[in-house]
Structures are given as C-alpha cells and as structure tokens.
Amino acid sequence: MKSTLIIGCGIAGLTACRLLESKTAVYLCEKDRIGGLCIPNLDYYDRAIQENGYAFGAYGDHMFHTENPYIAKLFKSIYPTAVAYEHRTEIFVNGKFLPYPPNIKTLQHATVDEIVAPYTAKQWGEQSTDDITHILKRFTTYNDYDYRTFKDRYQYVPYAMDYGKPFISPDVDTLDITNHTEMDYEDVLECDHDLIINTSPLDKFYGKDFLKYRSLEFEVGIDYGNNFKDRAMTINYPERTFAYTRVHHHGKYIVYEYPSETGLPMYPVYNPDKSLELIRKELPELQYHSVLGCNCRFFVHKCGNKIILHVGRLGSYQYLNIDKAMMSTVGAITWLTVQENFFQDK
C-alpha cells in the first residue's frame, strides 16, 4: 500500500485525510492545531459552555455553507458534532447597525461604496482601486430583506460543542502531529512517502517568500453592559475610526478582530490577474489544474517517484470559503485517482 504524508491539518488537510484513509497509509504533519482556523477558543471553552451553552472560535467565526450536498455530507463526516446554524452579520456605518451583506434595508441608509471599499482596504491593507477591484467582486448585495449572511442550503458551525474535535480514523498515524516542526520541500525529498499533500503556504514550502498573506489578531473582552444583546453575532466596522475590523459577541464575551500583516498566514492576498503569473514564474515545475464547476484549483509537482499536491487556501494560494477549500482537495484526489491511477497496485 502506498503511503501519504499530509502537511497541515486544517479543513483541506482533514478532507484529504478523510478521503484517503482507506486508500493509503496516512500520516499527518501538524504542529499544534488540529482543525486549523475552525477550532474553539480553549482558554474560554469551559466558561463559554457553562454560560452560553456553546463555544466560540479561536480565530473568529468560521461558518461552513454550501449548495453542494456531497461536500456538505463530507464536512459532517469530518465534524460529526457540527451544528446546523444560520449566521447573521451586521455592519456599523453612518452611525447605524445595518444588515450585511447589504440588503434593501442596508442600501436605504448607506451606499455600497461607503460599505465595501473602506472595509476591504482596512482588512486587506490595499489602498489603490486596482489592488482591491478583484476583492470587491467577491461581495454581493441582496435584493430583499433577508438578514442571513449566507443563503446556501447547507450551513453549519464546526466548533460549537465537544471541542469541535474533527473525526480522524484510528488507522491514521497521528504521531507526527506534535513531534514535527514545519516540513518543506527538502524534507519531503528525503521522506519515504509516495504522495505528499501540502496545505501550508505555497511559496514557503519551497523556501521562498514571493507571495503576500494577511493575518488576524484577536482580543477577548467582557461586555459588562450587555451592549450587544440585540445585535448580530458578528459586526463589521469599515470606518477607520475603529482599529478593529470586526467584533464577534458570544453572550458576555466580546472578541475584537484586528487585521495584521504579520503572524500566522491565514489569507492569501490573491490577485487573479497577477498571482498565478507570479507563481508560474517562480515555480515553473508546478502543473496547474482547475477544478471543474468550481472556482478553485490545485497544483501538482512530480518529482521522481513522488507526487506533491498543493491544495486548500494556502497550498493553492486562493481566497476560498471552507467548501471551496474542500473542493480543491477533492478535485486533486479525483485527478490523482482517475487520471494517474495512483492508488492502483502496480
């Protein structure tokens, strides 16, 4: 049986683990966070469960939403304790709390330019119109009074209960999780695994530093005045008056979210007109593959008898929702199975 090493154990790595556990021997390499950004804040876990009945995220509110029934079922197999939940978000602009994404009510009190452009520049650190145009295209407006953040058929929160612990088959060797430091290309060349699935930052895997990332910092406070009782769970603050970009409130706990250029890489500063061209220039050995019917991709690197797949938000260097990060991984493993016959005994 072939052997697979998965680098990183966020949603893309967990998806690969779930899909491959019956096909190969699977080894996980992760320093400290099983679940990636979808983990609860363990410092406040017991108190939050006791006082609110649920936990809140260590890295803000991360919600799974999709129209794809296969991806929804796969997500539930990874997070069996995930809870069905429809999120609400507001934005504070012109002195008012308004629904977000903008709906009819929002646009009665503020323009799209007042809402989207300043928030995008603040969150991503991009100032020029050329830099943020591709980011603005991701935003949507609703021609109704629906307050929900997402309208997808399947919506879950992964970490509400049971520590948000993802399912990992007992057949998967997890010994490497706490013993490994970060692995890179040189380490991979020396390992004995046939397949390597990388979900860590693409350029840094090859010992380079040509791609931009954004990070976030979080500060937990107490809402002694119960000021957010009737507000949405997440509130966006686009105006420069506020240093933070979002506030997440969970009972009396208030989590302030600040953008940062340093720290744990969380979001690729991806420009579709520039980033892919730069990747092809700096890493010409990579093969590019798009996933059919999905605005996501993966990269393939064949080196000797090994195959390296780069998937997920950081591995494929794309800004992706949870479902699209999973689809990047599903697409890569499907390609490996169908096009390469990789898992057939030879």
Residue ranges with predicted function:
Residues G10-A12, D32-G35, A121-G125, D184-E186, ...:
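Short, solvent-exposed loop/turn segments at secondary-structure junctions
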Residues R47-V112, P118:
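Dinucleotide-binding Rossmann-like beta1-alpha1 core, especially the glycine-rich loop
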Residues M183-F298:
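Mid-domain catalytic core of redox enzymes
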Residues T15, Y70, M327-G331:
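Short amphipathic alpha-helical face segments that pack within enzyme cores
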Residues P272-K346:
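C-terminal catalytic lobe of FAD-dependent flavoproteins
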Residues E21-D46:
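Glycine-rich FAD pyrophosphate-binding loop
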Residues H87-E90, N94-L195, T199, D203-Y206:
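Active-site/ligand-binding neighborhood in enzyme catalytic cores
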Residues K2-Y27, I333:
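N-terminal Rossmann-like FAD-binding beta1-loop-alpha1 element of flavoenzymes
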